[in-house]
């Protein structure tokens, strides 16, 4: 049993409208009626297009032993009747989303010995989480965010995976609106927190990069005097380091207790010198070397010895759609989970230092850039035009507009709208040659992983 109904009422300041027959608590939490299993607590959430209250009856039919309901909901009486019929508990709350968050926070506090680590940043959150999971698993029993459940709904969902045997919890904190990071920090209350970078992701929502930095900094808002934050050595270092409680470690090459040398080895990754040991980072790119520096700094603060840090780092696997290198008839780098101007520039920088007979770049639109989208896509096109790629393929309306504003010289350029995936596949298939190196980079919304079967084809 995760929590008793008495604990739920205390945590969410709810009123129990009716009791469950034969159950004192619940074993799991779900807000998706399709995923409900017996003995779940169902929490109906209101979205922009769908109201979870519509699915309360379905959740009860599938075996949910309790449901929360919004006490302001006009048909609350119907749900009480359903709960009575199915023998489930019904708890009325003022707001079901806030109740989910309060319940997750309450549940997390039941494990005071758990070392809580929070990770945020414009990019690199999931990669840093996976690096940290691998490193800390050398010594501790670790629980970590499944996938990228890092939002105001996803973080609470992640916290319910914590169990008594876990010693370290590593959680992503993402945001796409002002004020969300403080809410997430209040839910988790991290002992340690990493900011991977302050880029231009979400600039379309927050307006400026400075506003993004201010929002990311909120991950430190619940710090005590014993908490430790980690920030990169960049233009926002001083701003991010100025916090009222706790202390901040700046991670980068050099510095006391940190890596003293980094060697970029292209698609094979990089090597980092730490306490006399060369640690291999198996993910390509300088940006991933920086991600590794953050994790090394974190692990050193927690007290892991260098040999455990090395063993863990060297067994890191790339998360889905991130820095995934495949060597077949072609060599290709699949980095299609997320894209913003900074990660695009990092990918193109990586490719510039790769030795290949011929290079082909496939670039998909970057999302959530607002009024800066046109300029951002134009700048990426300028970088691509100056590269040594044989051909550049762009996919999406923003890049289709941007390519027309750039001088490409003798470089072949192909532009495809989102509804022209088949045409992109056919043209790419006809042009690729055995031995080519192909970069595939775009936002999640354009789903460029659909090109992978084509890229694996024997040539």
Curated annotation (Swiss-Prot):
EC category name: ligase
Annotated keywords: ATP-binding, Cell cycle, Cell division, Cell shape, Cell wall biogenesis/degradation, Cytoplasm, Ligase, Nucleotide-binding, Peptidoglycan synthesis
Cellular compartments annotated: Cytoplasm
One Pfam family linked to the record: Mur_ligase_M
EC numbers on record: 6.3.2.10
InterPro entries to which the protein is assigned, alphabetical: Mur-like_cat_sf, Mur_ligase_C, Mur_ligase_C_dom_sf, Mur_ligase_cen, Mur_ligase_N, MurCDEF_CellWall_CoF430Synth, MurE/MurF_N, UDP-N-AcMur_synth
GO CC terms in record: cytoplasm
Pathways per UniProt: Cell wall biogenesis; peptidoglycan biosynthesis
Gene Ontology process terms (BP): cell division; cell wall organization; peptidoglycan biosynthetic process; regulation of cell shape
Reaction it catalyzes: D-alanyl-D-alanine + UDP-N-acetyl-alpha-D-muramoyl-L-alanyl-gamma-D-glutamyl-meso-2,6-diaminopimelate + ATP = UDP-N-acetyl-alpha-D-muramoyl-L-alanyl-gamma-D-glutamyl-meso-2,6-diaminopimeloyl-D-alanyl-D-alanine + ADP + phosphate + H(+)
Residues noted as binding ATP in the record, renumbered to the chain: 121-127
Predominant cellular place of this UniProt entry's protein: cytoplasm
GO molecular function: ATP binding; UDP-N-acetylmuramoyl-tripeptide-D-alanyl-D-alanine ligase activity; UDP-N-acetylmuramoylalanyl-D-glutamyl-2,6-diaminopimelate-D-alanyl-D-alanine ligase activity
Transmembrane annotation, as ranges: none
Coiled coil: none
Protein family membership: Belongs to the MurCDEF family. MurF subfamily.
Function: Involved in cell wall formation. Catalyzes the final step in the synthesis of UDP-N-acetylmuramoyl-pentapeptide, the precursor of murein.
Listed name of the protein: UDP-N-acetylmuramoyl-tripeptide--D-alanyl-D-alanine ligase
Originating species: Treponema pallidum (strain Nichols)
């Amino acid at each position: 049993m995760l929590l008793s109904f008495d604990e739920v009422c205390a945590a969410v300041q709810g009123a129990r409208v009716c009791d469950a027959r034969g159950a004192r608590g619940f074993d799991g939490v779900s807000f998706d009626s399709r995923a409900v299993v017996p003995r779940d607590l169902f929490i109906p959430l209101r979205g922009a297009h769908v109201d979870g209250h519509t699915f309360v009856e379905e959740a009860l039919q599938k075996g949910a032993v309790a449901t929360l309901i919004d006490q302001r909901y006009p048909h609350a009486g119907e749900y009480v009747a359903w709960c009575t019929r199915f023998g489930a508990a019904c708890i009325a709350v003022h707001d079901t989303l806030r109740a989910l968050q309060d319940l997750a926070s309450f549940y997390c506090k039941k494990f005071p010995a758990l070392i809580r680590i929070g990770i945020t940043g414009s990019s690199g959150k999931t990669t840093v989480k996976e690096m940290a999971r691998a490193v800390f698993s050398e010594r501790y029993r670790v629980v970590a965010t499944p996938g990228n459940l890092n939002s105001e709904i996803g973080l609470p969902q992640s916290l319910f995976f914590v169990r008594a045997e876990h010693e370290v919890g590593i959680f992503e904190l993402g945001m796409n609106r002002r004020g969300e990071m403080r809410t997430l920090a209040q839910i988790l209350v991290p002992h340690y927190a990493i900011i991977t970078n302050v880029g231009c992701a979400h600039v379309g929502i927050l307006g400026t990069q400075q506003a993004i930095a201010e929002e990311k900094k909120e991950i430190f808002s619940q710090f005590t005097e014993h908490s430790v934050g980690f920030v990169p050595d960049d233009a926002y270092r001083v701003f991010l380091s100025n916090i009222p409680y706790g202390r901040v470690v700046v991670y980068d090459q050099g510095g006391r207790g940190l890596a003293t040398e980094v060697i970029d080895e292209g698609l094979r990754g990089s090597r980092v010198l730490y306490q006399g040991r060369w640690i291999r980072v198996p993910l390509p790119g300088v940006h991933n070397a920086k991600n590794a520096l953050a994790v090394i700094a974190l692990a050193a603060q927690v007290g892991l010895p260098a040999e455990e840090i090395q063993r863990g780092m060297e067994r890191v696997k790339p998360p889905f759609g991130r820095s995934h290198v495949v060597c077949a008839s072609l060599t290709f780098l699949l980095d299609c989970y997320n894209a913003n101007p900074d990660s695009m520039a990092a990918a193109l920088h990586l490719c510039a230092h790769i030795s290949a007979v011929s290079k082909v770049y496939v670039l998909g639109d970057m999302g959530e850039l607002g009024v800066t989208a046109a300029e951002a896509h134009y700048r990426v096109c300028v970088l691509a035009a100056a590269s040594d790629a044989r051909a550049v393929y762009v996919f999406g309306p923003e890049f289709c507009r941007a390519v027309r504003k750039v001088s490409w010289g003798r470089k072949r350029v192909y532009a495809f709208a989102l509804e022209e995936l088949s045409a992109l596949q056919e043209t790419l298939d006809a042009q690729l040659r055995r031995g080519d190196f192909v970069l595939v980079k775009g936002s999640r919304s354009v789903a460029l992983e659909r090109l992978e079967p084509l890229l694996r084809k024997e040539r």
